[in-house]
Structures are given as C-alpha cells and as structure tokens.
Amino acid sequence: MFHMLTCFNLKPGVSIEEFGQASARFTKHMQERELVHSTGPIGRRQSNTIMDTDSERNHEYFFITTFLDRAQCDRSVEYILPHEEPGESIHHAVYSKVADPVFICWEDL
C-alpha cells in the first residue's frame, strides 16, 4: 500500500465539521473512480506530550489517505491537476478550507 499523510490547519472561519464533510464527499468521489483506496479519520494534534518532537511544523490536523500502490496515487494526481470537472469543484471544496498544507508520502515495505 502507498500512503499520504496530510498535515494542515483550517482557514479562519472554517469548522472541522465543514472540512470533514467536504473531505468525505471528495473521498467517495475518488473511490468511485478507483483513484483512492481509503481515507482515515481526521486527527487533532496533541503537542503537549513529550512524544511530539516535531518543532518544525505547527499543524493542528492530520489524516492519512491510502492508495493501493504508487500508480493509483499518481493517477489521482493526474485526475486533479488539469482542474477540470467533475473533479475540480469537489477537490476545491476541500482544498479551499485548508491553510499551510504539507503532504508526506510513503510505501509499505
């Protein structure tokens, strides 16, 4: 499996519930096109523990998207990059709610 960690903050005035609803619609849209396997739950950072050692980033929210393999991930990017419908508006509904996104990808060994 191939995974992508999304680290982000919300733009002012956007609730995590609004983001979650938009993200769920986007995931369903991508699953229907076989462009994503699954998306995990949204997590809120708990930086007040000694186990949180990342001082470079100040993101509040995280979630993991899972793809069957790197090829599926690459196809999902190819689907999004042209900014064409039907994908454009549903992706924009998610991406427009976030600030300072960082994406980290890895593949299971």
Question: What annotation goes with each model-predicted range?
Answer:
Residues 2-9, 62-64:
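Active-site-flanking beta-strand signature of metal-NTP-handling nucleotidyl enzymes
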Residues 10, 15-17, 84-86:
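Charged, amphipathic alpha-helical segments and their flanking helix caps
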Residues 13-19, 71-75:
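Short, conserved charged micro-motifs
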Residues 25-37, 52-60, 64-103, 109:
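An amphipathic, aromatic/His-enriched active-site/gating alpha helix that lines ligand/cofactor pockets
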Residues 44-52:
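Carbohydrate-binding/catalytic loop surfaces
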